[in-house]
Amino acid sequence: VRIECNTIYDNIGKLKSGKHAFLPVSGVILDNVEVELSGGESAFDVIKKACEENVCTDNCKYCKANGVQIEYTYTPAFNNYYIEGIHQIYDKDCGTQSGWMYSVNGNFPDEGSSSYTVSSGDVIVFSFTCNMGEDIGNYY
């Protein structure tokens, strides 16, 4: 599992006040962390577990106590969890088209992360986009 927000550095002028403290120097919050699967987990389950069990690459004081912060809400209409923020970086924090997206093995699934069942060996990346995914390689 990898969590990255390096696109923010290309759009730093749009970043909301007070959010600079949560940006890792490298732009990477978690770097290729392995998560043990028992079978049937979703991409959401994996990211949640990775955040609970690890600290960020900067080993910041915010993560030392409880792991990497992650906030999400359940959306009944889509029967899915929506990731609002990771490491205190939330959707719309870097412009109106910013937020979190995920890819599995380099592809962006057409379904929410809690609907996508992962397999052992999958490479899961949660990336912060500042431009509806175009800046991270997701072109509709």
Predicted feature residues:
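Ubiquitin-like/PB1-type beta-grasp interaction modules and other compact soluble beta-rich domains
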Residues: V1-Y140
